[in-house]
UniProtKB/Swiss-Prot annotation:
MF GO annotations: lyase activity; nucleic acid binding; ribonuclease A activity
Keyword list, A-Z: Endonuclease, Glycoprotein, Hydrolase, Lyase, Lysosome, Nitration, Nuclease, Signal
Quaternary structure and interacting proteins, as annotated: Interacts with and forms a tight 1:1 complex with RNH1. Dimerization of two such complexes may occur.
Compartments (UniProt record): Lysosome; Cytoplasmic granule
Claim: Hydrolase is one of the keywords in the record: yes
SMART domains given in the database record: RNAse_Pc
Highest rank taxon of the organism: Eukaryota
Name recorded for this polypeptide: Non-secretory ribonuclease
Species annotation: Saguinus labiatus
Pfam families documented for this protein: RnaseA
Purpose: This is a non-secretory ribonuclease. It is a pyrimidine specific nuclease with a slight preference for U. Cytotoxin and helminthotoxin. Possesses a wide variety of biological activities.
């Protein structure tokens, strides 16, 4: 009985350690608000190939991000989506601060395909016109004052 309990406790500690590592890999850099980090990760008015575009994101992380979506629209247009009807987030049913874009936008989906060394991340690019769903929150003091509610998470593309 004792070895089984001890083994279970070790497994639990390992699981907790791995989950905290996963959270730290997806955490935003401390110097940015959630909206600023959203803008860096997901707003790109002029499409670039993913291998180049992802450098702006990967330089703040200790690894090559596996995948990412760039919306080819303005931050102000995405802020306007925050005014659409609230809905449960399709990507996380425990959140109800999501909003559907209502219109399709051009976007680029990036998928890591090459070496996973931070200095040499290689991506494939897929272009599409799709709807998107964003989570929005009240602005942080570091966010532009003209936007009381700002996008903080790209939940889903549809």
């Amino acid at each position: 009985m004792v070895p089984k309990l001890f083994t279970s406790q070790i497994c639990l500690l390992l699981l907790l350690g791995l989950s905290s590592l996963e959270v730290s890999l997806h955490a935003k850099p401390q110097q940015f608000s959630w909206a600023q980090w959203f803008r860096i990760q997901h707003i790109q008015t002029t499409p670039l190939h993913c291998t180049y575009a992802m450098r702006a994101i990967n330089r703040y992380q200790p690894r090559c991000k596996n995948r990412n979506t760039f919306l080819h629209t303005t931050f102000a247009d995405v802020v306007n989506v925050c005014g659409n009807t609230n809905m449960t987030c399709p990507g996380n049913a425990s959140l109800n601060n999501c909003h559907h874009s209502g219109v399709r936008v051009p976007l680029t989906y990036c998928n890591l395909t090459g070496p996973q060394t931070i200095s040499n991340c290689v991506y494939s690019s897929t272009q599409a016109n799709m709807f998107y769903v964003v989570a929005c929150d009240n602005r942080d003091p570091r966010d532009p004052p003209q936007y009381p509610v700002v996008p903080v998470h790209l939940d889903t593309i549809i």
